[in-house]
Amino acid sequence: MPYQAESMTSQPQMTVTSYTVSHWSSDVCDCCDDCGIRLCGAFIPCILGCKVAQDNGDSCCLPFLPGAMVALRTSIRDRYHINGSVCDDWVIMTCCSFCGLCQLAREQKARG
């Protein structure tokens, strides 16, 4: 008995996933909002970077790779559906990495 493939009688439908775009819970320059995060970011930023990466489900070695903090910020922005672009992420993590890292840590803390 030869194999007969089932024929399709209708086209697959496109599914649209909608979500609400949100905003950062704190501004980039709000470093004084959380004293613990600010001190950790100022004196041991590598530890804060590792914590942010691990809380995002990434390797703790991620912050030590060139350009990885931009990707980490983009990943967190995508996870929480925060409005912005990769260019915004690059500018913040390149020009003001301390403030950007502290903002990421505050965002994770605020969203649990």
UniProtKB/Swiss-Prot annotation:
Signal peptide: none
A Pfam family reported for this protein in Swiss-Prot or TrEMBL: PLAC8
One GO term describing the cellular component: cornified envelope
Disulfide bonds: none
Record-stated family: Belongs to the cornifelin family.
Annotated protein name in UniProt: Cornifelin homolog
Higher taxonomy: Eukaryota, Metazoa, Chordata, Craniata, Vertebrata
